[in-house]
Amino acid sequence: METLQIAGKTFESRLFVGTGKFASSDLMEAAVLASQSRMVTVALKRVEIGRVEEDDMISRITRHPEITLLPNTSGVRSAKEAILAAELAREALQTNWLKLEVHPDPRYLLPDPIETLRATEELVRRGFIVLPYVQADPVLCKHLEEAGAATVMPLGAPIGSNRGLKTREMIRIIIEQSRVPVVIDAGIGAPSQAAEAMEMGADAVLVNTAIAVAEDPVSMATAFRLAVEAGRMAFEAKLGSVRSEAEASSPFTSFLNLK
C-alpha cells in the first residue's frame, strides 16, 4: 500500500484520529495506539499555554515520537480568532502543523468558507502547514489549494453526527480535481463508511466520535484501521466497473457445446 505524503512528510497510516470525547486519557491512548494512526488531533481550547507538559492527554501523545500532533482551532468563529489560536499553538506545542476549523454556528458546527479561506491565506504566509476543515465544495477546495493548503478536509456529514458520507458526490469531484491530499473529516460513523471513502480515492480519513463513543473504543479503533487499509488496497487494486446488466463470471458456452 502506498504511503501518504503531506507537505513533504511521510505517513504510514491513512487513518487520522481525534482525542475528544474519550472517557479517560488511558482509554484515549490505548485507542490511538490500536488505530496505528500517525496523525492525532487535539483541540487548542484545551491547551493551557505554558503548562503543556502538565497536560495529561497531550503528554500521552507526545511520548510516542512516531505520532504527529495536529492542533486544531475548534471553537474559533473568525479568521482573526483562528490566526491568534494558531500562533498560540505554535508557541505552546512547537509545531507549524495546524488543522484549521472556523465554525461560528454552535449548533451544526459547519465551517465558514469565507473565513476559512481568509485564514488559510494568512496562515500559509506565516509559515503554517494548514489542513483546513471545509464544506464539501469543489470550488472552495480549489481556492484553498491555490492558497497553499497542504490538504483539503471536506466533511462527510456534520461533526459528531456519525451519518456517513452524505456529501459523497461532491467528494468525488473534489478527489478528481485535487492536487493535494483529500482527507475526509467529520461524519464518519462506521468502519464501512471509512472503507467507502478510501475506495472512492480519498487519501485519508479523520475519525474521532465513532471511536471515542463506542462501547469498546480500542476494538473500534482497530476496526477502523483495518477498514481504511482495506479500502485503500481496493482503490489501488482498481475496482471493477459497475454494470446495469448481469454478466456471468463463468459462461456456460463451452459446457453446453460438449459432445
Curated annotation (Swiss-Prot):
It comes from the Bacteria. It catalyses: [ThiS sulfur-carrier protein]-C-terminal-Gly-aminoethanethioate + 2-iminoacetate + 1-deoxy-D-xylulose 5-phosphate = [ThiS sulfur-carrier protein]-C-terminal Gly-Gly + 2-[(2R,5Z)-2-carboxy-4-methylthiazol-5(2H)-ylidene]ethyl phosphate + 2 H2O + H(+). SUPFAM superfamilies: ThiG-like (SSF110399). 1-deoxy-D-xylulose 5-phosphate binds at residues 160, 186-187, 208-209. GO terms for molecular function: thiazole synthase activity. Signal peptide: none annotated. One of its GO terms (cellular component) is cytoplasm. Pathway: Cofactor biosynthesis; thiamine diphosphate biosynthesis. GO terms for biological process: thiamine diphosphate biosynthetic process. The keyword Nucleotide-binding does not apply. It is an enzyme of class 2 (transferase). Keywords: Cytoplasm, Schiff base, Thiamine biosynthesis, Transferase. The active site is at 99 (schiff-base intermediate with dxp). It is found in: Cytoplasm. The keyword Coiled coil does not apply. Homotetramer. Forms heterodimers with either ThiH or ThiS. Belongs to the ThiG family. This is Thiazole synthase. It comes from Porphyromonas gingivalis (strain ATCC BAA-308 / W83). The gene is thiG.
